[in-house]
């Protein structure tokens, strides 16, 4: 009996005083994902990578905005969103105490303004994403990037229409052999 008491005293405290002081977690711990809306460009790469569909985006044409939503209740803390984010706007934190009183507290939302096409005036992309692409080109030494802003702010459909050759200008007979 004395040997057991001696061993307990020598070992010390076996449990932590958790509610009173936080538990230390490993540096590679994957906790609650946190999104920085100022850094996010609304590219939706995280939405495509999320296996549990915890991230969603919807285009609201009435307001001209892209609605980004993160549901923490669906998250499996895999870290794919953090890996694919081009601007490092999503980081997995060390936070593990995620209990809430209401389901609505599990939701994080951000809204991003859409860019309207310069030709057809329909929204097609997030303005921050276009600005980010131009800034990235400038950073990599392309001095003409700002000059091509009009092209960046034109939707793919209008670009295709601009590049099409009218059918009355196509001469089909030049590719055919003459019949004898």
UniProtKB/Swiss-Prot annotation:
**Which is a Gene Ontology cellular component entry for this protein?**
membrane
Positions of [4Fe-4S] cluster 2 binding? 75, 78, 81, 85
- Residues annotated to bind [4Fe-4S] cluster 1: 40, 43, 46, 50
Q: Which InterPro entries match?
A: 4Fe4S_Fe-S-bd, 4Fe4S_Fe_S_CS, NADH_quinone_OxRdtase_chainI
4Fe-4S ferredoxin-type domain mapped to chain residues: 31-60, 66-95
Keywords of the record: 4Fe-4S, Electron transport, Iron, Iron-sulfur, Metal-binding, Repeat, Transport
UniProt-listed Pfam families:
Fer4_7
Q: Which PROSITE patterns does the UniProt record give?
A: 4FE4S_FER_1, 4FE4S_FER_2
Q: Tell me a GO biological process for this protein.
A: aerobic respiration
Any one GO molecular-function label of the UniProt entry: 4 iron, 4 sulfur cluster binding
Quote the subunit structure annotation.
FHL comprises of a formate dehydrogenase, unidentified electron carriers and a hydrogenase (isoenzyme 3). In this non-energy conserving pathway, molecular hydrogen and carbodioxide are released from formate.
What function does the entry list? Probable electron transfer protein for hydrogenase 3.
Descriptive protein name? Formate hydrogenlyase subunit 6
> What gene, per UniProt, encodes this protein?
hycF
């Amino acid at each position: 009996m004395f040997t057991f008491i001696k061993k307990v005293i020598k070992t010390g405290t076996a449990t932590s005083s958790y509610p009173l002081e936080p538990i230390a977690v490993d540096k590679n711990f994957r906790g609650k994902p946190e999104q920085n809306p100022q850094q996010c460009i609304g590219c939706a790469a995280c939405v495509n990578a999320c296996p549990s569909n915890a991230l969603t985006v919807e285009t609201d044409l009435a307001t001209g905005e892209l609605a980004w939503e993160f549901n923490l209740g669906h998250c499996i803390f895999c870290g794919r969103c953090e890996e694919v984010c081009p601007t490092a706007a999503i980081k997995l934190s060390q936070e593990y105490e995620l209990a809430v009183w209401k389901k609505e507290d599990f939701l994080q939302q951000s809204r991003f303004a859409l860019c309207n096409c310069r030709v057809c005036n329909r929204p097609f992309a997030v303005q921050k994403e276009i600005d980010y692409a131009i800034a990235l080109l400038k950073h990599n030494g392309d001095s003409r990037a700002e000059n091509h802003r009009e092209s960046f702010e034109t939707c793919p459909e209008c670009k295709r229409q601009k590049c099409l050759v009218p059918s009355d200008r196509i001469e089909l007979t030049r590719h055919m052999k003459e019949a004898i």
